Curated annotation (Swiss-Prot):
This is Nuclear distribution protein nudF. InterPro entries: Dynein_regulator_LIS1, G-protein_beta_WD-40_rep, LIS1_N, PAC1-like_LisH-like_dom, WD40/YVTN_repeat-like_dom_sf, WD40_repeat_CS, WD40_repeat_dom_sf, WD40_rpt. The lineage of its organism: Eukaryota, Fungi, Dikarya, Ascomycota, Pezizomycotina. Residues 60-86 form a coiled coil. One of its GO terms (cellular component) is spindle pole. GO terms for biological process: cell division; establishment of mitotic spindle orientation; microtubule sliding. Belongs to the WD repeat LIS1/nudF family.
Length: 446
């Protein structure tokens, strides 16, 4: 023992053993051990109390460390198997070719300032600004390249539930929604002044998205079972879509703003035509609430068409061919927009919270309450090709892709969150994603 422990460590261990025997009323054993170890009479009752429980704490601590070691060894084995499965030529190509980029295992930046869970994030379409909304009722603006907090926006009376940048070219606005029943518009060119507050929903507003970057139209989804379309230049609601859903949780527009897909608490997903405010398809198949939904970009059509059994991919100009949805049933489903289920992706261990397509169209990224980011390869029938475990310390609530680089300004003016409105075949894009979590942190992965 003396060769492993120092004298002071050995003394502490001996006294902890005597204290443990005393605490379980094994007086005879305790006294015998004291004599054997030469612990004198100065080890009185007060000193004994000091060492009570220490042995159990060390024992349980060792057990926790052993479990952690086993988890880490399992993760190392999994990562090594993943690495071994990729030929060296392919690995080097992945670093050179943005089309095959997957996020690193660890984040490039971690932003910490919020005092409650992160619910939503959004990238500025031109500048290196990233907005984050939280249950702490604030919005924070970060420089995601420098990793610095720029400002904090206050105005909502309840938690912020959704964010999006958009508006006409040259006049980008930030829209936010909240459990306080309002939508607020913030002007980055005026130090993010709150220039307008939109009223009309009768319950919590779950999500906001700009329809396109060339119009002043904004869509919102709410717990009041309605979807509203707003003219941000006037603040008026120009169209209301109602349904039997008890609570819309998410809404997403097609890249041309002609279609909407929305999901909610009734387990159903509905595709709506914006011009007529009429439903065009119902996507039925999830076994629990639908947390997120998104139209697939045209770049993914060739892969999704193959999954759907089609010999030919739809035209890139078509804006509403395929949809991805994520649910509390722990699955991701890929659909034809007309309502046919083509694939269910299984792998997450908890609610799916957010989805984003790789701009190349080859991959779909997902985040979940299981604290992972998962990357699904659509060119391999949706095979799970990468998992970033413990990407956050708590539930991951949202994910967004950075917009195109500044030198692609013409394209950037025609994008929303990295997806081109003009659907070019080879759009320029940045290999950057951001995630937000219930751990109150925002992380940027490169």
């Amino acid at each position: 023992m003396s060769q492993i422990l120092t004298a002071s460590q050995a003394e502490e261990l001996h006294k902890s053993m005597v204290a443990y025997l005393s605490s379980i009323k094994a007086s005879q054993s305790s006294n015998t051990l004291r004599e054997e170890l030469g612990i004198g009479d100065n080890f009185d009752e007060a000193t004994c109390k000091k060492y009570e429980g220490l042995l159990e704490k060390k024992w349980t601590g060792i057990a926790r460390l052993q479990r952690k070691i086993l988890d880490l060894e399992s993760k190392i084995t999994s990562l090594q198997a993943e690495l071994d499965s990729v030929p060296s030529m392919a690995r080097s190509k992945q670093h050179q070719d943005p089309d095959n980029w997957l996020p690193a295992q660890s984040s490039a930046h971690t932003f910490e300032s919020h005092r409650d869970a992160i619910t939503s994030i959004a990238f500025h379409p031109v500048f290196t600004s990233l907005a984050s909304g939280s249950e702490d009722c604030t919005i924070k603006i970060w420089d995601w390249e420098l990793g610095e907090l720029e400002r904090t926006l206050k105005g909502h009376m309840r938690g912020v539930s959704g964010l999006d940048f958009g508006g006409q070219k040259g006049h980008t606005l930030l829209a936010s929604c909240s459990g306080d029943l309002t939508i607020k518009l913030w002007d980055p060119s005026k130090d993010y002044a709150n220039i307008r507050t939109l009223h009309g929903h009768d319950h919590s507003v779950s999500a906001v998205r700009f329809l396109t970057s060339t119009e002043n139209l904004l869509v919102s989804a709410s717990r009041d079972a309605s979807i509203r379309i707003w003219d941000v230049s006037t603040g008026y609601c120009v169209r209301t879509i109602t349904s039997n859903s008890i609570w819309f949780l998410d809404v997403s527009p097609s890249f041309d703003g002609k279609w909407l897909v929305a999901g909610g608490r009734d387990q159903a997903v509905t595709v709506w035509e914006v011009s007529s405010a009429e439903p065009r398809a119902a996507l039925l198949g999830h076994d629990n609430d639908v947390q997120c939904c998104v139209f697939a970009p045209p770049a993914s059509y060739e892969y999704l068409a193959t999954l759907a059994g089609h010999k030919k991919a739809p035209l890139a100009s078509s804006s509403s061919e395929f949809i991805a949805t994520g649910s509390r049933d722990k699955t991701i489903k890929l659909w034809e927009a007309r309502g046919r289920l083509i694939k269910t992706l299984v792998g997450h261990d908890n609610w799916i919270r957010g989805l984003v397509f790789h701009p190349s169209g080859k991959y779909l990224f997902s985040v979940s309450d299981d604290k992972t980011i998962r990357c699904w390869d659509l060119s391999q029938e949706g095979r799970l090709v990468k998992t970033i475990s413990n990407a956050h310390g708590h539930f991951i609530s949202c994910i967004r892709w950075a917009p195109p680089p500044r030198n692609a300004a013409a394209e950037a003016s025609e994008t929303t969150n990295g997806v081109s409105k003009k659907a070019p075949t080879k759009p320029a894009f940045q290999c950057v994603i951001a995630t937000g979590s219930a751990d109150s942190c925002v992380r940027v992965f490169k």
